[in-house]
């Protein structure tokens, strides 16, 4: 896809189109909008695109995003934000990034302000750090640490919001030997943790979740279809072949009734017909 026009562009200015430019490996390196000098038909634009690498006709072009691949060497169009090691996370990054997106520069719509986001990888191609400009005019940095299986066991988000304030959000996760989440902890600026835990049955289905002090149980029927969730704030039931409100029974997996209740309020129900 090299050029497209949506309904808003057509209605506002029939000469305005969205465009995409590609590199020699057929990857998008620039996207934006162009206002053509004259109104062109689809056939004329298709002919230009099919016969020349310079397929965008004359007009005023406004780039909205540039993408850099394969290298951490900045170009005229795309800067690169520096990697900074974070204690407890990767001390370095891989430079073998052929085929990977390394940096993206994006325009804030309606302005001449650009935001740059650079992504760093380990030698397995996993993201270990992203460094990006934020709308406050400062830098945000996200670090990730993995276990041998590739699960994220730690993540740290650092967002500088003023010259004197940086907010830090930290996550820690644990998994079982099948890669399923067992527990997670989140802290903001070193404060009290928000915790969650998960319990599974013998066939691997999630049957219990606990968020802080609120516990939710999850039920299934013998076919593995979800039949209900229950916690103090909210309860719900799904019925299939066993409706209680006069709806026709469904034996093929369609839901016949959905009942829910908030706290101690009266239960409500939908019945479905197919």
Residue ranges and their predicted role:
Residues 4-7, 14:
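General structural concept
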Residues 12-55:
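Hydrophobic or amphipathic alpha-helical targeting/insertion segments
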């Amino acid at each position: 896809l090299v050029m497209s026009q949506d309904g808003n562009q057509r209605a506002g200015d029939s000469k305005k189109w969205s465009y995409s430019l590609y590199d020699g490996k057929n990857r998008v390196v620039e996207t934006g909008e162009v206002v053509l000098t004259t109104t062109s038909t689809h056939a004329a634009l298709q002919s230009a695109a099919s016969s020349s690498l310079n397929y965008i006709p004359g007009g005023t072009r406004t780039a909205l995003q540039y993408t850099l691949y394969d290298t951490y060497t900045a170009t005229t169009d795309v800067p690169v934000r520096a990697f900074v090691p974070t204690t407890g996370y990767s001390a370095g990054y891989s430079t073998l990034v052929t085929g990977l997106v390394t940096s993206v520069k994006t325009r804030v719509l309606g302005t001449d302000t650009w935001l740059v986001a650079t992504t760093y990888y380990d030698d397995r191609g996993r993201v270990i750090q992203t460094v990006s400009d934020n709308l406050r005019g400062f830098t945000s940095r996200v670090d990730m640490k993995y276990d041998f299986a590739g699960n994220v066991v730690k993540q740290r988000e650092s967002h500088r919001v003023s010259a004197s304030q940086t907010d830090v959000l930290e996550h820690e996760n644990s998994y079982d030997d099948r890669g399923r989440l067992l527990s997670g902890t989140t802290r903001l600026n070193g404060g009290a943790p928000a915790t969650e835990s998960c319990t599974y049955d013998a066939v691997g289905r999630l049957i219990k979740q606990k968020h802080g002090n609120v516990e939710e149980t999850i039920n299934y029927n013998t076919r593995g279809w979800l039949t209900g969730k229950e916690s103090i704030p909210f309860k719900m039931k799904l019925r299939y072949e066993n409706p209680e409100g006069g709806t026709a029974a469904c034996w093929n997996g369609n839901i016949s009734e959905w009942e829910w209740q908030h706290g101690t309020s009266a239960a409500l129900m939908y019945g479905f017909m197919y």
